[in-house]
Amino acid sequence: MSRFSSALQLTDLDDFITPSQECIKPVKIETSKSKTGAKITIQEDGSYVQESSSGIQKLEKVEITLADCLACSGCITSAEGVLISQQSQEELLRVMNANNLAKLNNQRDEIKFVVFTVSQQPILSLARKYNLTPEDTFEHIAGYFKKLGADMVVDTKIADDLALIECRNEFIERYNTNRKLLPMLASSCPGWVCYAEKTHGNFILPYIATTRSPQQIMGVLVKQYLAKQLQTTGDRIYHVTVMPCYDKKLEASREDFFSEVENSRDVDCVITSIEIEQMLNSLDLPSLQLVERCAIDWPWPTVRPSAFVWGHESSGSGGYAEYIFKYAARKLFNVQLDTVAFKPLRNNDMREAVLEQNGQVLMRFAIANGFRNIQNMVQKLKRGKSTYDYVEIMACPSGCLNGGAQIRPEEGRAARELTAELECMYRSLPQSTPENDCVQTMYATFFDSEGDLNKRQSLLHTSYHQIEKINSALNIKW
């Protein structure tokens, strides 16, 4: 079963096959010229051997990186084994063990400051698995990471709030100055973004919001803001995020999120809910409660909050649609809304909300989850029949709470039942208010400081790139 979202799996209908069958990345093999030719044979262990007049030579194994796959118009899931190996629990444990050894031997030049950022959805997935409250779960997970050698464990709320504020501002700007680029499409789901770049290219990309996802905003905060507070540099920090889907591994590997100045990626490693479960299982722990809890770190310039697991309005995928809808209603039409009702259309994964005044439709927003609804939305946009001003798009059915790397339901239980439980847990969380002292202080002291008018744009926004289709004989299906 594939680990990536359906938006990536279904780029081509026959995509779920092994790398040796399908990967079309051109590879240069250094061989000596031979007038007599050479024969390549496959050995029993799967290795390749070249036989020529000069002798027998074992060919080197092709190495394909995440960056290669993001720049390729071919498959995604066919190279899945290669991708996961570079963003995996094994790689994380290798780095942590090496760092702990460097600390033990006082090898200061080799020691890195390790930061774990944990998003809400994995916390809820683990809380449900181990029958704990979300706050207790987070503290036990923090204790586990500290035991591995983490120096700091933080939540994502500040990045979630920054993403919401930047998205709302971007929407207002578009609505007032460039309505041709409406509907504005959400940008926080990497599965959707990757699919858009590879399949619809320059037609769809201008509609996608440029605001970075919370994961990548956290990357900026950790590698730049936190590095400055610690009086170090970004390449001296190893940043790990815990996310609900495998597509976040692809997002962290985008070249857009590599800093030439810091010589490091904003996020070095992404692990998922399932991988955390596997790591805990490897310790033969019957319950997460057996792990000593640890307080969550708070490195931001305001008073420490009373809670660290927060929810957002309307959806478990960040609450973009409802937050922007309410803000735009107030800002554009002077309409104050306490709640927004998103009504299901053909299915629960396609919902819409409409702002009306005197029988006239002022705004129309939608939430589109899952590949089927994404396809329908894009086709309507291409035919010029889209009536929406904003669409919150997530590749996974039911959104991020049902991310592809969330812990699976027990045997005999439907995934839909588990998702409903997680949604209930999410709605019980304290509601985040993006306009808070912490966010305002970060804007004043970091993003808008020093008179640099481009700093906020460069650190909180990104760009997208059409992936050209490769016309190669290797693409031909027989």
UniProtKB/Swiss-Prot annotation:
Residues reported to bind [4Fe-4S] cluster 2: C189, C245, C396, C400
GO terms under cellular component: cytosolic [4Fe-4S] assembly targeting complex
Keyword Iron: yes
InterPro entries: Cytosolic_Fe-S_CAF, Fe_hydrogenase, Fe_hydrogenase_lsu_C, Fe_hydrogenase_ssu
Biological process terms in GO annotation: iron-sulfur cluster assembly
Top-level taxon of the source organism: Eukaryota
SMART domains: Fe_hyd_SSU
Single GO molecular function: metal ion binding
Keywords from the UniProt entry: 4Fe-4S, Iron, Iron-sulfur, Metal-binding
Chain sites annotated for binding [4Fe-4S] cluster 1: C23, C69, C72, C75
Pfam (any one): Fe_hyd_lg_C
Family the entry assigns: Belongs to the NARF family.
Protein function: Component of the cytosolic iron-sulfur (Fe/S) protein assembly machinery. Required for maturation of extramitochondrial Fe/S proteins.
Protein name as annotated: Probable cytosolic Fe-S cluster assembly factor AGAP009023
Naturally occurring in which organism (per UniProt): Anopheles gambiae (African malaria mosquito)
